[in-house]
């Protein structure tokens, strides 16, 4: 989630399993690109975990839940992808959604740049991704009742999109450097 103030990006929250990290916009690694009008702009570089929904500010190993890096996400520099080149834009009326008890299926509307973009995905109330793999599945393992592969998270509609802070939860530290992010824990 990007937090804007007067149209200027100020902070970014990256989801990491049950938690995540929030960084000041100025702290993030950036790459320069050009718009269709040949304007130079900067976009943040995020690292997507292999086989996971988690996002990180740096490449490498990212342990979570279990000690000694036994359960970790792995990221690397991989191919650079600019999501702005193939993205859909939307407007979300969280007040209308909240007042209807979450049943207002018109609370998400496509932007003028993509008026035919689908919206039904947003209202899906189940978990995204795989279900918890059984222990008999050769990819699955557990230690101290913590499974390596678990059922995916709920979608963006259920991520407190009407929140005042950039983080999903009240407990949040806005980080002002990548180094501070390396020292922080995943559940901050």
List each model region and its residues.
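Domain-length functional cores that host ligand/cofactor binding and catalytic or interaction surfaces
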Residues: 1-188
């Amino acid at each position: 989630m990007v937090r804007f103030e007067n149209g200027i990006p100020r902070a970014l929250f990256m989801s990491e399993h049950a938690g995540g990290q929030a960084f000041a916009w100025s702290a993030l690694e950036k790459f320069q690109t050009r718009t269709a009008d040949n304007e130079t702009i900067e976009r943040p570089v995020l690292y997507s975990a292999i086989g996971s929904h988690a996002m990180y500010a740096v490449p490498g190993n990212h342990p979570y839940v279990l000690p000694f890096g036994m359960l970790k996400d792995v990221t690397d520099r991989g191919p650079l992808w600019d999501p702005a080149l193939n993205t859909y834009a939307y407007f979300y009326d969280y007040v209308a959604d909240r007042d209807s008890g979450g049943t207002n299926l018109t609370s998400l509307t496509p932007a003028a740049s993509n008026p035919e973009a689908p919206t039904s995905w947003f209202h899906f109330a189940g978990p995204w991704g795989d279900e918890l793999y059984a222990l008999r599945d050769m990819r699955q393992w557990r230690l101290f009742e913590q499974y390596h592969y678990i059922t995916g998270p709920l979608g963006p509609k259920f991520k407190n999109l009407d929140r005042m802070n950039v983080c999903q939860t009240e407990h949040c530290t806005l980080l002002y450097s990548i180094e501070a992010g390396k020292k922080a824990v995943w559940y901050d």
